[in-house]
């Protein structure tokens, strides 16, 4: 196991003065646990909410670590955007990552995952599963990871001053160091915050038995320099009934990255050899400028949550000359996805037991390649091509040359109304959502369509600690824009078929919750069907004159989740399990639905467990947690998964188990200062996560140390 304990001890001594300084200046800080109420999901049971306090008591530096106790979520291998995620087996094509209610469903390239926010900047993370109710927002077919960023008011709670400074630092024995600072304050009705965090990670070592293409123990090109900051200014007025917040967040990854970030590098005979993977310096950036307003007691409107945002995803590569997906651009290459959106969410009380939720959502996305390259389109003639075939190729080239390409765009608009009524131990929910989309592909073609999506739910509380729930929700998701990196046109025109509709999910779910303060249990069973499943053209390597995005079949998924916890005194014990079985039924002649991880993955039944004890004096918690994934067989494609020779593959993902031990010490006896230690993957297990393909694995044994 790669655990340099002597370096850890040295770092502890080095930071001792920093602890004392923090204790002196922030002795009265008391951060409350953030309680999230009503995430606009109606009667849907929600699980696994990570609060600011829980985050501060962990060594997590990414969402994979922060959410590892949620069995329904699986993260792939690698670092940064090398990782894919699945939620109930469904991939990033239909799972959103929302930060301060800003989100985009466009991707840079199908060989890399979506950008996930730095947890150092957030105060709470929740998980929405399955198709959402009417108020869940645009495209809520398969759930979301929802994060809210921290602000000055959160950090000022409990202080006897109107300003403060927070410092944090961390060290990972498996080649990583992190540090950051936050400055925050309040003057009159105004408050502000600036927070900066850096996590500098070198190539990490995988588990015992792993060897890379050069015979070494490290995973090639897994190093990343992650830098993020958050700036916020807010004002509260009207006796606290009104609040306006303007924020800007930027999160950036820098490093030497491969063409296909989900893969590392294989030997010379491999399809992912060093020549095809062509590592180059790259920067991937996500920024969000957000203006938010919260108002209470506005006459008929009891509460209003509104925001407007500009979300940008940028990719910069120092040289893409060996990257065919990027058009083989020599020298610097820039790609950008810009999303502008607004949300207005109203709550009105019709009667003492009836709450009415209603609102509108708007989102416009635009992809901006560095240049359009359709003038360089070329179809290579086969070695024994006939004159007629060559003539056809030249004609197809002329078709592509004739197009005047423009930035592809998509606009989604939605409106909803939802009523929640309480009567005699029952909470009844009913809603209706209207969604409309308009897509313009880079050839100028436009397609639009609308859909109505009802939702129903009931919660029954027969006794004080029990409740049972059922929901039946419909949600739709518009066609995704084609990969931003490939909109240049050098490999042909990507259009959209006439009559293309939004795919539509129907999710039926039953569940229960029990919580008496000591023992708690919850569970759910779901069945989901998605009609008119969407797919972009999947053959991204060949030069074809014109290809189209289409509706191409349907998807079915079913599964269950169970969880239980026991708390008494300082003892906390938890256990959870999740199982899902997504299957894709492709009705298109060209079989466009794919087993690529952007669509989903058949993950094995996943178990999580943890046991911890917190002592009163000293205020110290020590614990263990485990994540165990059973073997998974079969493809998500109902017809089976074929290799490059057209033969059916026997898809098997091996099971694995990973154990961690952790500790949290509060030297001042409260949340003012946290000193965290964890030993992740104690037994140095070498394994491949189920949401990933081929060669990217996760870190082996790792000692992590952090304070905040």
Show which residues each predicted segment covers.
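Flexible loop and strand-edge segments within Gram-negative outer membrane beta-barrel domains
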Residues: 240-302, 312-336
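Periplasmic-side early beta-strands and strand-to-turn transitions of outer-membrane beta-barrels
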Residues: 153, 160-163, 177, 182-281
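Acidic, small-polar-rich N-terminal luminal/periplasmic segments of exported/outer-membrane proteins
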Residues: 24-157, 261, 288, 510
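Outer-membrane beta-barrel signature, preferentially recognizing the C-terminal barrel domain
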Residues: 271-298, 335, 404, 408-410, ...
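Conserved C-terminal beta-signal and adjacent last beta-strands/turns
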Residues: 9, 23, 227, 234-238, ...
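Surface-exposed extracellular loop regions of Gram-negative outer-membrane beta-barrel proteins
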Residues: 252-254, 261, 265, 312-314, ...
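Signature of Gram-negative outer-membrane beta-barrel scaffolds
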Residues: 355-467, 478, 489, 576
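Gram-negative outer-membrane beta-barrel transporters
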Residues: 352-353, 422-428, 518-521, 525-530, ...
């Amino acid at each position: 196991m790669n655990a340099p304990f002597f370096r850890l001890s040295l770092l502890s001594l080095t930071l001792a003065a920093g602890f004392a300084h923090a204790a002196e200046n922030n002795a009265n800080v008391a951060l409350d646990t953030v309680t999230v109420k009503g995430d606009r999901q109606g009667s849907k049971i929600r699980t696994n909410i990570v609060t600011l306090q829980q985050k501060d008591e962990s060594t997590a530096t990414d969402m994979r670590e922060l959410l590892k106790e949620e069995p329904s979520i699986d993260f792939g291998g690698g670092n940064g955007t090398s990782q894919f995620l699945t939620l109930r087996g469904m991939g990033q094509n239909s799972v959103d990552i929302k930060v301060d209610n800003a989100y985009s469903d466009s991707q840079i390239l199908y060989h890399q995952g979506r950008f996930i926010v730095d947890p150092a900047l957030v105060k709470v993370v929740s998980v929405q599963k399955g198709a959402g109710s009417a108020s869940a927002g645009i495209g809520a077919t398969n759930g979301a990871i929802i994060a809210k960023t921290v602000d000055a008011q959160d950090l000022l709670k409990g202080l006897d001053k109107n300003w403060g400074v927070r410092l944090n630092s961390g060290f990972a024995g498996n080649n990583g160091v992190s540090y950051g600072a936050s400055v925050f304050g309040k003057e009159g009705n105004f408050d502000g915050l600036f927070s900066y965090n850096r996590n500098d990670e070198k190539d990490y070592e995988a588990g015992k038995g792993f060897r890379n293409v050069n015979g070494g123990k490290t995973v090639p090109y897994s190093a990343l320099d992650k830098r993020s900051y958050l700036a916020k200014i807010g004002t509260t007025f009207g006796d606290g009934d009104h609040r306006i917040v303007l924020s800007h967040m930027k999160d950036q990854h820098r490093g030497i990255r491969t063409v296909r970030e989900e893969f590392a590098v294989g030997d010379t005979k491999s399809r992912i050899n060093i020549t095809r993977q062509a590592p180059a310096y790259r920067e991937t950036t996500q920024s969000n400028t957000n203006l938010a307003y919260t108002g209470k007691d506005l006459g008929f409107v009891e509460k209003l949550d509104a925001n407007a945002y500009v979300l940008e995803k940028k990719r910069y590569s120092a040289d893409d000359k060996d990257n065919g997906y990027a058009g083989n651009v020599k020298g610097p290459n820039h790609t950008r996805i810009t999303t502008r959106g607004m949300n207005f969410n109203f709550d009105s009380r019709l009667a003492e037991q009836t709450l009415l939720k209603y609102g509108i959502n708007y989102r416009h996305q635009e992809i901006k390649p560095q240049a359009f390259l359709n003038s360089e389109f070329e179809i290579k003639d086969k070695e024994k091509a006939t004159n007629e075939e060559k003539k056809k190729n030249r004609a197809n080239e002329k078709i592509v040359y004739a197009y005047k390409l423009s930035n592809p765009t998509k606009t989604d608009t939605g409106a909803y109304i939802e009523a929640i009524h309480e009567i005699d131990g029952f909470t009844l929910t009913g809603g209706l959502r209207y969604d409309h989309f308009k897509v313009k592909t880079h050839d100028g073609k436009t397609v639009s369509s609308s859909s109505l999506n009802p939702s129903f739910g009931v919660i029954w509380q027969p006794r004080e600690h029990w409740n049972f729930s059922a929901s039946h929700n419909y949600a739709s998701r518009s066609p995704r824009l084609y990969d931003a990196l490939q909109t240049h046109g050098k490999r042909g025109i990507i259009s959209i078929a006439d009559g293309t509709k939004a795919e539509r999910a129907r999710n039926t779910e039953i569940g229960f919750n029990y919580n008496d303060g000591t023992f708690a249990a919850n569970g759910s069973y779901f069945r989901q069907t998605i009609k008119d499943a969407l797919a972009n053209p999947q053959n991204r390597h060949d030069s074809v004159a014109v290809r189209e995005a289409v509706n191409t079949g349907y998807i079915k998924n079913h599964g269950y989740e169970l969880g239980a916890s026991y708390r008494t005194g300082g003892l906390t014990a938890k256990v959870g399990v999740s199982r899902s079985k997504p299957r894709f039924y492709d009705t298109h002649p060209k079989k466009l639905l794919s087993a690529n991880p952007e669509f989903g993955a058949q993950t094995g039944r996943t178990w999580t467990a943890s046991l911890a004890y917190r002592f009163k004096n000293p205020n110290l918690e020590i614990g263990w947690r485990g994540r165990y994934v059973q073997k998974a067989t079969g493809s998500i494609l109902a017809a089976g998964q074929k290799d490059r020779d057209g033969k059916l593959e026997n898809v098997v993902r091996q099971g694995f188990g990973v154990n961690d031990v952790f500790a949290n010490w509060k030297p001042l006896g409260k949340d003012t200062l946290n000193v965290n230690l964890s030993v992740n993957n104690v037994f140095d297990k070498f394994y491949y996560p189920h949401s990933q393909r081929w060669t990217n694995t996760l870190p082996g044994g790792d000692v992590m140390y952090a304070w905040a």
